[in-house]
Amino acid sequence: KNRENDGNRYIAARAGQLSPETSYVLHRFGMRQPTYVNNIGTRVRDMDIRKIPGISDDISMKKAWNMMAELNAVTLPIVDEEDRLDGIITINDIATSYMENQDSTIIAQAKTPYRNILETLEAEMVVGDPEAVFERGNVLISAADPDVMEDYIHQDDMVITGNRYESQLSAIESGAGCIVVCLGAPVSRSIRKLANEHGCTVIITPLDTYTVARRINQCMPVRAFMRREGLIKFLPGDYTDSIKDSMQNTRIRDFPVVDKTGHYIGMISRRNLLGAKGKHIIL
């Protein structure tokens, strides 16, 4: 059959023990016994496995959201440096993080990399280390007079401010760990020098205060909200009949496929299960 060159590859197989007559004929013509196959059911490898790229656990929530929009996906796999599956994050996880987390310390609790903040706020760091992490302090907006704000700013806080010299000076002297200057306002040399002496990071963003306040939570790394425990994942050799219940009894829509060593291969969905193509058999 393979000599027909029709683009398919055919493999001889048997479903049980060979009869003595069949064994004799195969031996007589120098043919190997066909491979024993006890189940010809459809497997995960027969499904349309979608090659959604894995992401690092330190990318921002905003970047993950944008990737979902670009890929038309609702779930992203999170992998380590060796491409082993570490977890997943869904579009619902991201939406929930926006709606339910109102704690002003959540940015620090998530150990947010400054490079995420710079990317999300379209910002430039003029004092500080872009590879550092914001891991202590609250986030607050300097909306009152400096004399009033001094009572609210604590050590290592992130202060969102404008172009007022006095507000920037007050934040640094009050122990702020970072000030975010909005509307692209220039920061004077004296403020930069003072910030450097106090170990205060200075970031300039072209965005307005309202937009910065909206986006700041989107800077957090996905690891803060990713799902690690109880992941439903499948192997390429799993039979589709055996995975149906697992796929149907959860709200998750997409499921990762990994090899035996845990390396990520791709994603499958319930829709892929319905469209899975069975093996073609010639009797």
Describe every region a protein language model picked out.
Residues 104, 192, 197-227:
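Long, charge-dense
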Residues 47, 68, 76-94, 247, ...:
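A glycine-centered beta-loop-beta connector
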Residues 11, 34-36, 76-77, 158-161, ...:
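Short hydrophobic alpha-helical runs that function as membrane-insertion/retention elements
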Residues 15-18, 41, 81, 91-94, ...:
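Short, ordered loop/turn segments at secondary-structure junctions
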Residues 91-107, 213, 271-283:
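A short, polar/charged loop-to-alpha-helix boundary motif
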Residues 35-67, 79, 114-127, 131-165, ...:
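Bateman/CBS regulatory modules and CBS-like beta-alpha motifs in cytosolic regions of diverse proteins
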Residues 21-22, 186-193:
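Short, glycine/polar-rich helix-capping loops at beta-to-alpha or helix-loop-helix junctions
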